[in-house]
Amino acid sequence: SDAHAHEQQNAQRIITAGGSLTEIVFALELGDQVVATDSTSMYPEKARHITKLGYFRQLSTEGVLAQQPTLLLGASATGPSDMIEQVSGAGVDVVIYDMPKNLQGLRQLIEHVGEKLQVSDKAQHLATTISARASREVEAFKKQKAAYSPVDNRPMKALFVVSNNDRGLTVAGHNTVPQAMFDLLGIQNGAESLEGYKLINNEAVLQHNPDVIFVAGHMLHGKEALSHLCRHPAIAATFAGKHCLVKAMDSNVALGLSPRFAQGMSAISEHALQALALKAVNETATPARDKAE
């Protein structure tokens, strides 16, 4: 058929560098044109089984060219720069995307990729669907929050931890996807004054006293990891620490521009409401019991 011939002609050999781009190409139903990805591209399931070329910041020219790609789509940190020069010098179309880490940025990314792959209508539809889901998450969260505490409209407080080592906790601040999700839901981020991903000192965490803490799933190893984090010196004395309201989130959803953005909001909303339910119970507890503690 004509349509089939047209498709054959337009078929690309695509390399995606960055989990978000891989996910978007699959969401646009062009996953069968992806010949290789970087090592962070583990979703959807089919993407796991595609040739992996290593970490997207450190791709090798040989590795990329060996796949005979026609197109390389890369997240902003894709590199090194000499690889990009050599690959485009070899005649591969290279497009590097740098988008703001928020819902608007995700929509733009989807639309740009859709345009590049000649599926603009599909991309427009996907972007609109994601926005609509995000709006529904916001409505549902606000409604449920109001039901718990009709009088108390103080924002919930949260923190998103991306790594934990001897130097302290590294958290998601301004211009990150967690911040964008918190903003939409009206949740206050304890690291909002920091730019990007930064170390936060223990006092700042205690002072903010988060109701709930989220952590990037990739940093958790073993069953004890979450309870271990609840006992962290910065966290133990906070509301979230005392009640061990520390929840893991899929790193690709929570840190990247994923088409699963609304599902990420849903996970944040669900855990924030658990914390709210617990607070409601605690605050209605009798003063006598409080004294006994």
PLM regions: where:
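His/Asp/Glu-enriched short active-site or ligand-binding loop at hydrolase and phosphoryl-transfer sites
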Residues: D38, H174-Y197, G217, K247-A248
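Basic- and aromatic-lined ligand-binding clefts that recognize polyanionic substrates
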Residues: Q12-V25, K122-L185, A254, V281-E293
